[in-house]
């Protein structure tokens, strides 16, 4: 089984749910503020902000929190955040991409480098692993959103490129530049999604054993706990048997 969303599910089951929720809301709020500051404070006039708000709603972020994050962008004391991407190799040669929004590049780079080094991996240069990934849009709906055929029909009409329906939900992907329009059309047909975001999808996978899987999990967990880190993507491929053991 590929990707690291399965690992994220494990982390959420093992971690304190309130702490996880608070961390997610904090990262969503930062993205909303940055999006609002870079463009218009009206989601209808700002595609990036519209996407950020859609994703926040999909994560059940309270309306007051969303509005407060937007208003913060117009304040005089708002931090200036830089968008930074880090790339490197983790345990077992797993390629890792880290996206961050930071007001202190030196601090974030130091923390990310330390996480890679502690795991036995190494932080590389920009472009060192991203060639093994494609930048795409991903929209996730819960299973109860509809049957696989119904979701497929809606996705095709919306201009999506692929749909994977599983027990955990429906995963719809589209071109990176189309995610705003596709997600908006899908919402009119299926309601609000569980998740809407642009992701790095691995095109080359690195098979790993249980020992390496545990090390990769620790690396991803450490990175995602950093307040500056918004997203982490990895190209590991782990068996269902190992995944089941890790989820115990």
From Swiss-Prot:
User: Which ranges does the record mark as transmembrane?
Assistant: none
The record's GO CC annotations read:
cytosol
What InterPro entries has UniProt attached to this entry? Integrase-like_N, TACO1_YebC-like_2nd/3rd_dom, TACO1_YebC_N, Transcrip_reg_TACO1-like, Transcrip_reg_TACO1-like_dom3, YebC-like
The superkingdom listed in its UniProt entry is Bacteria
Q: Main localization of the protein? A: cytoplasm
Mind listing the GO biological process terms from this record? regulation of DNA-templated transcription
Alphabetical list of Pfam families matching this protein:
TACO1_YebC_N, Transcrip_reg
Q: Where in the cell is it found?
A: Cytoplasm
Bridged cysteine pairs (disulfide): none
Keywords associated with the record: Cytoplasm, DNA-binding, Transcription, Transcription regulation
> Is the Cytoplasm keyword given for this protein?
yes
GO MF annotations in UniProt:
DNA binding
Alphabetized SUPFAM superfamilies for the sequence: YebC-like (SSF75625)
Q: Does the keyword DNA-binding apply?
A: yes
The entry's family comment says: Belongs to the TACO1 family.
HAMAP family this protein is in? Transcrip_reg_TACO1 (MF_00693)
- The protein depicted here goes by the name Probable transcriptional regulatory protein BT_2363
Origin species, per record, is: Bartonella tribocorum (strain CIP 105476 / IBS 506)
């Amino acid at each position: 089984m590929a990707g690291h969303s399965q690992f994220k599910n494990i982390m959420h089951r093992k971690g304190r749910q309130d702490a996880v929720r608070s961390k997610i809301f904090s990262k969503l709020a930062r993205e909303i503020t940055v999006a609002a500051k870079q463009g218009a404070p009206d989601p209808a006039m700002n595609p990036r902000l519209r996407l950020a708000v859609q994703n926040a709603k999909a994560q059940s972020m309270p309306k007051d929190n969303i509005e407060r994050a937007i208003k913060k962008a117009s304040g005089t004391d708002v931090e200036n955040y830089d968008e930074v991407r880090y790339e490197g190799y983790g345990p077992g040669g797993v390629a890792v991409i880290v996206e961050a929004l930071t007001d202190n590049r030196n601090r974030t780079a130091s923390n990310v480098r330390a996480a890679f080094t502690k795991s036995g991996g190494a932080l590389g240069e920009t472009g060192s692993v991203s060639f093994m990934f494609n930048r795409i849009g991903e929209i996730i709906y819960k299973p109860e959103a509809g049957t696989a055929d119904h979701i497929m029909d809606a996705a095709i009409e919306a201009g999506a490129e692929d749909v994977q329906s599983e027990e955990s939900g429906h995963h719809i992907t589209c071109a990176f530049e189309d995610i705003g329009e596709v997600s908006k059309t899908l919402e009119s047909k299926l309601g609000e999604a569980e998740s809407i975001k642009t992701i790095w999808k691995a095109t080359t996978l690195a098979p790993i054993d249980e020992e390496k899987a545990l090390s990769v999990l620790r690396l991803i967990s450490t990175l995602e706990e950093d307040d500056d880190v918004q997203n982490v993507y990895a190209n590991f491929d782990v068996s269902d048997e190992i995944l089941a053991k890790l989820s115990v």
